[in-house]
């Protein structure tokens, strides 16, 4: 039996690869659209909301990037979030432990948000993206998480 690379593989190699990068929920939310490794558009959410260091979901920045690239959310090959929540949480715990007991109040204040929201960003991001694209979650491309310093 022959491998099934043939025509479909060739067609994919000739098409463009569109990747949407997202930073959100910490500070300075933003989005960037890459096509075949080249930056097509990038924007910070604060440029649209006029809220300094806006940490919200970057819906307006995403819309801008998609419009500039003349693509829709479902046309993307990948959506990539700038960090891995579990890795970030581990760094946070290590930092608190290394300074303990000094950061106890800060630690106690940040834990509820981490345990309720930030550890489950994949669900939140997919829901926000589906709402933004007016589509079902299943219609969205693969959502990936990059190492912070690689994104």
Regions found by a protein language model. Give the residues of each.
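Short acidic/glycine-rich loops and adjacent helix/strand connectors
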Residues: 2-151
